[in-house]
Amino acid sequence: CVELNFNTCNCKAEMLIGILADYFKGKGADLEKCKGSVNYDPFKKPLVKGKENEDWVEAAAAVLKAGAALPGYKVLAVNAFYFNNAGAYISQELGYALAWGNELLAKLTEVGLDATEVAKKIKFNFGISSNYFMEIAKFRAARWLWAEIVAAYNPACQCACKMHVHAQTSEWNMTVYDAHVNLLRSQTEAMSAA
């Protein structure tokens, strides 16, 4: 089974999940084996556009409930790559990512959702800079710290402590003048994320 990942407008995430579930059912696919993500990011609007997103908890809860139809799909996204592409330090990107993940867990458990189910539906999207060893350390630290954060919510299953990560090479350090240097940077970034 191939993993399918979708980025869509936040206002259409719930609808896309329904479309995907109906499509997979129509094709006779085993929904337990379908893997992927629909990246609903409640923090994108304030971070990227500078606009408030007051009803994000209700919207995230609705997306999470719709995501129950696709057990193998991650539907909540923590897009820390915005910081990487803006030139943030690795420690800043990691700190914000973990804070966002914790905020998702805290707010969604406050409205009655199960911490285990919420944690299993979160996917972290990190940016990778060309600082090879620090990026390797970032991923190791992120996995360990996320497990500690989720464990504080007393999940029913320890499998909820597992961090689901997607990495993408940085756009911040690329140059328009030398494509070959960009290839070397991207190779180093990809190796550190592997």
Which residue stretches match the model-derived regions?
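Catalytic alpha/beta active-site cores
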Residues: 1-131, 153-166
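Alpha-helix capping/termination and helix-coil
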Residues: 150-154, 191-194
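ATP-dependent phospho-/nucleotidyl transfer catalytic cores
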Residues: 144, 148
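Conserved phosphate/anionic-ligand binding catalytic regions in large, soluble enzymes, centered on
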Residues: 181-194
